[in-house]
């Protein structure tokens, strides 16, 4: 029984001597080496390819509310270009202006319409036309129609006693008709002259009161 025990011998552990160097390899490097590497890294960051960030005061400085509103207003308002193009002389009025003023044909048409058909023709010609020539023609024709009927009633034998003792009323209607006739004719002549003078001036809008 002693022989088997003699065969087995305890061998020395080969891994135990290597434990010391492995522990030394797992230990962190010294602080001096880390500081040197960090300094080299930050020196590299100072190159032109990596500019320094702005300071805290510059990065955190925001404009005030008034400055922001003023900047927004200045950017939203468009620049006004030269206004010389708006004042270009025109050889004639536009079509819309011609429709508002009218021509001599419309004036004569509404004039005879109001003169022949009296107040019915006056209302039709005044309401159906939108030009100054048409309405002034209606006013002038109605004034002449009023003069016509005053003279008919005054000197006709079919209407006796209408102005007996009231000749002032006859004169009132006669003068009223004469004033309406002159007002329509003279105002239309002024408008035609004004249109000719405005044809070489900048764009102008004129309001005519009838």
Curated annotation (Swiss-Prot):
Keywords: Golgi apparatus, Membrane, Repeat, Transmembrane, Transmembrane helix. It holds the Pfam family NEDD4_Bsd2. Disulfide bonds: none annotated. GO terms for biological process: metal ion transport; positive regulation of protein ubiquitination; ubiquitin-dependent protein catabolic process; vacuolar transport. Residues 127-132, 183-210 are extracellular. GO terms for cellular component: endoplasmic reticulum; Golgi apparatus; Golgi membrane; perinuclear region of cytoplasm. Residues 1-105, 154-161 are cytoplasmic. It is a multi-pass membrane protein. This is NEDD4 family-interacting protein 1-like. The lineage of its organism: Eukaryota, Metazoa, Chordata, Craniata, Vertebrata. The gene is ndfip1l.
